[in-house]
Regions:
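Conserved beta/loop motifs at nucleotide-recognition and modification sites
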Residues: 1-205
């Protein structure tokens, strides 16, 4: 590196730079993109620049005969990341729709997603919801919560909307159940796939 004269920064750009990059592509293709479409696109593809580039290429091909990209277009063609599927799962837990919860879970298993990772993401999601709900109860607005947690306003709004379906006591109880099942699965006292199913059946049944 010293001989070449400078180091290259391969870190992921921030959201502002990614937005500029992607919007330039949209504009170059002669399209527009709604804010809610961009929010959903970013949520589904922000794990890497390669993934984002590939998903945008796919999206632009899908809307080749349209003037703009809508939320419905993104939902129709862009692949969901695992954490987005887990959010959907929890939405169905909130509405007590156990068949949908189990359908989503088995879909993730079919793509070789490890049950322990799914359980970890469920725990992470409820942890976030608990912290956000607590901050909101102290009078903090979405922007303040987003700044303190280092995440996007859009994510805070989505999580707070979902968190309204649970009391603080329910979230605490669910996290205790999840932590217990996680420990039992990791020590071999219960099958890891069954651990997630037991948690979902208890809370969505």
């Amino acid at each position: 590196i010293a001989k070449a004269g400078s180091a290259v920064d391969f870190s992921m750009p921030d959201e502002r730079m990614l937005t500029s990059w992607m919007m330039a592509r949209v504009k170059a293709a002669g399209k527009t993109m709604t804010r809610d479409a961009w929010n959903e696109f970013f949520e589904r593809s922000n794990d890497s620049m390669d993934h984002m580039d590939m998903e945008m290429e796919k999206l632009l091909s899908y809307v080749y005969d349209k003037d703009g990209i809508t939320l419905e277009d993104v939902e129709a063609i862009c692949t969901k990341q695992v954490h987005t599927k887990v959010f959907d799962m929890i939405s169905f837990v909130a509405s007590k729709n156990l068949p949908k919860v189990l359908d989503l879970y088995h879909d993730m298993l079919a793509t070789k997603e490890p049950p322990i990772r799914i359980l970890a993401l469920i725990i992470r999601q409820f942890d976030q919801m608990y912290v956000m709900k607590d901050m909101a109860s102290q009078g903090m607005n979405v922007q303040t919560i987003a700044g303190k947690m280092g995440i996007r306003d859009f994510i805070v709004r989505k999580n707070l909307g979902l968190a309204r379906n649970f009391t603080m006591e329910q979230i605490r109880a669910l996290l205790e159940d999840a932590a217990d099942l996680d420990e039992r699965a990791k020590t071999g006292r219960i099958n890891d796939q069954l651990a997630v199913e037991m948690l979902m059946i208890k809370w969505a049944g």
